[in-house]
Amino acid sequence: MSKYSYKIATLAEGVEGLTNVETLGTCDKHVAPRGLDEFEAFSVYRTSASGLEYGDGYPHTVWHFDAIQEPQLTALLAYLGAETNQSAQVYITTRIADRTYKNYRAVMHRPKASEREPGNRTKYTVWHNVDVRFTMLEAQ
């Protein structure tokens, strides 16, 4: 049974097809992202002429994996479609500021290869500090 409720689905699968991230790939140890600290309700914050700050734009979140095995990462990145795609629209379930989970339609961005750190080589390669960004979140 999954410990967290981070989920993902393609546009074709819809919200009904959301799959728990902890079940992706065939590996020894599945992990969930640490997404709570990275949820922002707005894209940018601006200061009005009166000096008050307000939020503008879509919410966004980052799923940060301290360590993730290659099969789980490959299965997660498959939601981008082709290996050359840098982003794609998907459905996700992610944790928000009040510690509840909510469904969104979002744009998923491929993590930069230069930002991933290869870790120990056991049965599977383990990648460290992998960030998967989701922008333009629209509540479903």
Residue positions per predicted region:
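Extracellular/virion structural assembly segments
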Residues: M1-Q140
